[in-house]
């Protein structure tokens, strides 16, 4: 009977998020107490996909107590990350299996989003269940994974807090040197981060994909929603403000709108087939169009992106505690014979949830958790914005005032903008 210590392999996939090191530390410290050997694979699946064991060994580190004991305070990940995707071919998956077998990995912990978890489960499906167990800890600052109600993904609280500080500073700047800032916030499919930052900072407008009633968003509608808000504030003598835009608006745009954003070419994609939203330059494109319309009114507009500076911030206390619990939960799940599962926290307890139970049958991918636009939380955020509402359009004095600010007649203003109340939910 072998007395060789079990090997735990850990990797991070996808973009960074505050708290990655906390999961690594939590899992490693618990595993070491059990007498396991712990190794970290550098840059996610990148080197495992080569199938070259020597290359993998050269890019693998032993995770020891001295290395991980204090890293939970730090942003980023000490084992780095990448978007390498072994699901692109059966050969790549077999390469990963070959390397895991060569390094005698018994327990495989991946920290990432749905793509990383899907890759790990796919690799493990080609191995004997007694040969390897796979557990994933869900990670994304987008907060769009289907976790239990009111439970955020780790890193979200930190990203929202830092984003709030940045937007607060922009709001002071916008008033001090009068201008509008159009802030494009990360969030591939959902508007949780954009809305969270906007609500916390008191931004004057926030647009997220979930609030649009139609399946496809037109660029023109987004432009006019911002334009009407700018004119409403101008009518009150305020030629400045901050508008937060979820980059996920791009994911929901019509083909016509996408071609406009990407310069009449097919949108580029990442290794997992996702549109490279950053390349769309949404805030910049909107700024250019709005300046054409409002430049004669003396309105200044500056586009700003918020995203990468949030991903590697040192975690706030909530995420530091949360990620340590997830790391513990992963090892506990291994000890109890679980595999192909994600670790979640519900009612103060961490537990495994089978990966297959989180999949959307129609797409085969993990379900996306969207902002509930019928919730009180969304209504609270919306009521403090400067949008033109249906009630506003019923107020003839207000319409005349806002129209005058835009050098339009009330009739022309209403004809141009009133339909927008049917484009988004109220």
From Swiss-Prot:
Cofactors (names): Mg(2+)
Highest taxon above the source species: Eukaryota
Magnesium found in the keyword field: yes
Keyword entries, A-Z: Cytoplasm, Glycolysis, Kinase, Magnesium, Metal-binding, Transferase
One MF term in the entry's GO annotations: metal ion binding
Activity regulation field: Non-allosteric.
Amino acids binding diphosphate: 15
GO cellular component terms given for this protein: cytoplasm
Residues annotated as binding substrate: 140-142, 186-188, 247, 308-311
EC category name: transferase
Record's subcellular location: Cytoplasm
Active site annotation, chain numbering: 142
Pfam family name, one: PFK
Residue sites binding Mg(2+) per the record: 114
Xref: InterPro entries: ATP_PFK (IPR022953), Phosphofructokinase_dom (IPR000023), PKF_sf (IPR035966), PPi-PFK_TM0289 (IPR011403)
Catalysis performed (reactions): beta-D-fructose 6-phosphate + diphosphate = beta-D-fructose 1,6-bisphosphate + phosphate + H(+)
Record site: Important for catalytic activity and substrate specificity: 115
Gene Ontology terms: biological process: fructose 6-phosphate metabolic process; response to glucose
Quaternary structure, from the entry: Homotetramer.
HAMAP family: Phosphofructokinase_II_Short
Function: Catalyzes the phosphorylation of D-fructose 6-phosphate, the first committing step of glycolysis. Uses inorganic phosphate (PPi) as phosphoryl donor instead of ATP like common ATP-dependent phosphofructokinases (ATP-PFKs), which renders the reaction reversible, and can thus function both in glycolysis and gluconeogenesis. Consistently, PPi-PFK can replace the enzymes of both the forward (ATP-PFK) and reverse (fructose-bisphosphatase (FBPase)) reactions.
Protein name: Pyrophosphate--fructose 6-phosphate 1-phosphotransferase 1
């Amino acid at each position: 009977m072998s007395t060789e210590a079990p090997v735990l392999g850990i990797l991070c996939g996808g973009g960074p998020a505050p708290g990655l090191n906390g999961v690594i530390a939590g899992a490693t410290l618990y595993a070491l107490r059990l007498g396991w050997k712990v190794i970290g694979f550098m840059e996610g699946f990148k080197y495992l996909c080569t199938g070259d064991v020597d290359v993998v060994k050269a890019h693998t580190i032993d995770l020891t107590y001295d290395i991980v004991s204090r890293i939970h305070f730090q942003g980023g990940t000490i084992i780095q990350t990448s978007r390498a995707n072994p699901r692109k071919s059966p050969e790549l998956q077999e390469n990963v299996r070959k390397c895991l077998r060569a390094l005698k990995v018994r327990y495989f912990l991946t920290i990432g989003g749905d793509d990383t978890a899907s890759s790990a489960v796919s690799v493990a499906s080609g191995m004997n269940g007694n040969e390897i167990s796979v557990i994933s800890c869900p990670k994304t600052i987008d907060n769009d994974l289907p976790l239990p109600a009111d439970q955020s993904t780790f890193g979200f609280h930190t990203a929202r807090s830092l984003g709030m500080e940045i937007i607060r500073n922009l709001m002071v700047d916008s008033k001090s040197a009068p201008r509008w800032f159009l802030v494009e916030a990360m969030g591939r499919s959902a508007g949780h981060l954009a809305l969270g930052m906007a609500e916390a900072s008191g931004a004057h407008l926030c647009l997220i994909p979930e609030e649009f009633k139609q399946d496809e968003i037109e660029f023109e509608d987004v432009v006019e929603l911002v334009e009407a808000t700018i004119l409403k504030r101008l009518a009150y003598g305020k030629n400045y403000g901050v508008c937060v835009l979820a980059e996920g608006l791009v994911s929901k745009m019509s083909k016509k709108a996408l071609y406009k954003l990407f310069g009449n070419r097919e949108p580029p994609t990442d290794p997992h087939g996702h549109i490279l939203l950053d390349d769309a330059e949404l805030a910049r494109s909107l700024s250019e169009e709005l300046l054409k319309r409002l430049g004669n009114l003396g309105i200044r507009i500056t586009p700003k992106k918020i995203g990468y500076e949030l991903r590697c911030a040192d975690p706030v206390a909530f995420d530091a505690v949360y990620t340590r619990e997830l790391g513990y939960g992963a090892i506990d799940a291994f000890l109890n014979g679980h595999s192909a599962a994600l670790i979640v926290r519900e009612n103060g307890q961490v537990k495994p949830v089978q990966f297959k139970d989180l999949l959307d049958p129609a797409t085969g991918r993990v379900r996306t958790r969207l902002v509930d636009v019928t919730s009180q939380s969304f209504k609270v955020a919306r009521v403090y914005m400067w949008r033109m509402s249906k009630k506003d359009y019923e107020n003839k004095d207000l319409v005349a005032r806002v129209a005058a600010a835009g050098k339009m007649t009330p009739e022309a203003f209403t004809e141009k903008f009133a339909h927008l109340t049917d484009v988004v939910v109220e």
